[in-house]
Curated annotation (Swiss-Prot):
Lineage of source species: Eukaryota, Metazoa, Chordata, Craniata, Vertebrata
Cofactor(s) the record lists: Cu cation
Gene Ontology MF, one: cytochrome-c oxidase activity
Annotated protein name in UniProt: Cytochrome c oxidase subunit 2
Source organism of the structure: Conilurus penicillatus (Brush-tailed rabbit-rat)
Cellular component, GO, one term: respiratory chain complex IV
Cofactor note (record): Binds a dinuclear copper A center per subunit.
Gene of this entry: MT-CO2
Annotated positions binding Cu cation A2: 196, 198, 200, 204
EC number of the protein: 7.1.1.9
Enzyme class: translocase
Residues holding Mg(2+): 198
């Protein structure tokens, strides 16, 4: 999860987030090299008064600075497209959970079970227990099995929302009248926090998301107790 004064990304918990982190590092290195080259050229131009006459009109140079940026863009685009297709692909999910956004709470329905649905509201600050996080804790957590592909169906009952859990690499818009889907897969157990990431009204900041990823046997026990 996030911590105060954090500069980097949250620790990756899903294969998709691991790919996104690697892509971020890959792109950042390219940007760093380009910035270093530009600063070097600018410093040379500022510190020398000599002019190379052949560079005033050089077809070779113009060809290079046309082809080189195109090649760099390809190096950025190819891994980006790969991850984009990975995020959109859902293979044989073991569980489907329908998520509906409301002003200002989330409701969840486990479509593979009868009558397993609940609303999830933020816990007010004055009701927090020791160890719980302010503005991030909810009264009903979303319990899911770890290391298994889970399909999330996401929509909204009123205005635009966005269901986002950074450590899982998830951010999917909740649009009224439209059903979007995303894949949830966690490599380890734990609590993972997110929030609504689309400004949706005065209480937009008070729509937290808490996923509790547990081993399959614990999930089966929890689901049996909820039905």
């Amino acid at each position: 999860m996030a911590y105060p004064f954090q500069l980097g990304l949250q620790d990756a918990t899903s294969p998709i987030m691991e790919e996104l982190t690697n892509f971020h590092d890959h792109t950042l290195m390219i940007v760093f090299l380009i910035s270093s080259l530009v600063l070097y050229i600018i410093s040379l131009m500022l510190t020398t008064k000599l002019t190379h006459t052949s560079t005033m009109d050089a077809q070779e140079v113009e060809t290079i600075w046309t082809i080189l940026p195109a090649a760099i863009l390809v190096l950025i685009a190819l891994p980006s497209l790969r991850i984009l297709y990975m995020m959109d692909e859902i293979n044989n999910p073991v569980l489907t959970v329908k998520t509906m956004g409301h002003q200002w709470y989330w409701s969840y329905e486990y479509t593979d079970y009868e009558d397993l649905c609940f609303d999830s509201y933020m816990v007010p600050t004055n009701e927090l227990k020791p160890g719980e996080l302010r503005l991030l804790e909810v009264d009903n957590r979303v319990v899911l099995p770890m290391e298994l592909p889970i399909r999330m169906l996401i929509s909204s009952e009123d205005v635009l929302h966005s269901w986002a859990v950074p450590s899982l690499g998830l951010k999917t818009d909740a649009i009224p009248g439209r059903l979007n889907q995303a894949t949830v897969t966690s490599n380890r157990p734990g609590l993972f926090y997110g929030q609504c990431s689309e400004i949706c009204g005065s209480n937009h900041s008070f729509m937290p998301i808490v996923l509790e990823m547990v081993p399959l046997k614990y999930f089966e026990s929890w689901s049996a107790s909820m039905i």
